[in-house]
UniProtKB/Swiss-Prot annotation:
This is Tachystatin-B1. The presence of a 'disulfide through disulfide knot' structurally defines this protein as a knottin. GO terms for biological process: defense response to bacterium; defense response to fungus; killing of cells of another organism. Signal peptide: none annotated.
């Protein structure tokens, strides 16, 4: 069991399964609900 998803992990934009702190689910393409966890730019 993993509580959060790391960089490069597959994610769903509208999902309870979220990327780790400092990461976000970057869409594969605009309007997609699927993506990959990527580092946030602050």
């Amino acid at each position: 069991y993993v509580s959060c998803l790391f960089r490069g992990a597959r994610c769903r934009v509208y999902s309870g399964r979220s990327c780790c702190f400092g990461y976000y689910c970057r869409r594969d393409f605009p309007g997609s609900i699927f993506g990959t966890c990527s580092r946030r730019n602050f």
